[in-house]
Curated annotation (Swiss-Prot):
Stated name of the protein: Type II methyltransferase M.Sau96I
Organism: Staphylococcus aureus
Keyword vocabulary terms for this entry: DNA-binding, Methyltransferase, Restriction system, S-adenosyl-L-methionine, Transcription, Transcription regulation, Transferase
One Pfam family this sequence matches: HTH_3
An example Gene Ontology biological process: negative regulation of gene expression via chromosomal CpG island methylation
Recorded family membership: Belongs to the class I-like SAM-binding methyltransferase superfamily. C5-methyltransferase family.
CDD domains hit by this protein: Cyt_C5_DNA_methylase, HTH_XRE
Catalytic activity: a 2'-deoxycytidine in DNA + S-adenosyl-L-methionine = a 5-methyl-2'-deoxycytidine in DNA + S-adenosyl-L-homocysteine + H(+)
NCBIfam families from the UniProt entry: dcm (TIGR00675)
Residues annotated as catalytic: 174
Lineage: Bacteria, Bacillati, Bacillota, Bacilli, Bacillales
Domain SAM-dependent MTase C5-type as annotated: residue spans: 99-429
Domain HTH cro/C1-type: 9-63
Amino acid sequence: MRLNKGSIIEKMKNQNIKTQTELAEKIDISKSQLSFMFSDEYEPLKKNVIKLADVLKVSPNDIILDEEDQMPINSDFNRYDYKLDEFIDVSNVRKNKDYNVFETFAGAGGLALGLESAGLSTYGAVEIDKNAAETLRINRPKWKVIENDIEFIADNLDEFIDEEIDILSGGYPCQTFSYAGKRNGFADTRGTLFYPYSKILSKLKPKAFIAENVRGLVNHDDGKTLEVMLKVFIKEGYEVYWNILNSWNYDVAQKRERIVIIGIREDLVKEQKYPFRFPLAQVYKPVLKDVLKDVPKSKVTAYSDKKREVMKLVPPGGCWVDLPEQIAKDYMGKSWYSGGGKRGMARRISWDEPCLTLTTSPSQKQTERCHPDETRPFSIREYARIQSFPDEWEFSGGVGAQYRQIGNAVPVNLAKYIGKSLVHYLNQFN
């Protein structure tokens, strides 16, 4: 979307607005933000275009140059107005000061470990699952691991935090809000795990936050769930941006898409010299043969004899369509007759492709992920490699608990690039 600068200058004269500085003040953005809006190198946020049009007392379409970008008149809150398609290479970014992170729903530590790799320091990590909490303690004894209910922590935050926090992070579950959109505040979110996350954000007021979730959040409950979240973040005083990031683009041998929401505190946005941008995709995308070399031995869930005989017939890169028809029918049951979504059944991954999204169980029928050569699921350490955990990162609990922790984790390398994009942004203020 490009703005019609000539039209804007004319409208400024009509409203007796003499300078860009005055215009920026009326829109309640910084002068640099306004300059970015006018630059052909940046995509202006639709919400800022709407605010600009409101100040100039015109329709947004009167100041948009490209006809294909014209906005619907009197449009309601639209989650896509906050989708940011601006990226920057952060491969070589280094911090110029220390930034600390308070993480919620930490799980096995994929997000926290990735942020640490980006140069950020974990002040505290909240995790109620005993095995995941123990995983964090084993690997990072110096982290303040808080094994407690997130709602209790949100209500008694002063008991757990005694210093200023730079970044709040976490991946709360995707849940429907009972009154989504009616009040557009905390009350909409009571009874969900987003509520304590937003309450912690409200109390800490960090410079920035990272909220990570499944891709399905974008259209969950017809988009209402995401829109309520964005409204809450905005009311708390944050500029918000989101996008879908595919882990395969960020040194992870796995096609795993997640929505990442970034919030920047408004006072920083007004002072910024350059805006936040998401990390640019890396040129090389790893495949299984890149990450599954010399993997340490570890436990693995075994197939049943019947399933093993079926999976022996599937070639690398293949699935149920490569099976003899009668065997496929017997194996798939009712799924044979249902339409679509069956390519994950009896799936054997090839060495020359990334893994499909790992789940919390390595041998579920609908989301099979069979080893390329051996007729078995991926082992614990193979699972961890695919999620870009280092070999020295230990997982607590039984085999099932370990698979669950790894399958639920944010891939470490994806988290690293997200962290680097925030470090790049925050570095400008030092």
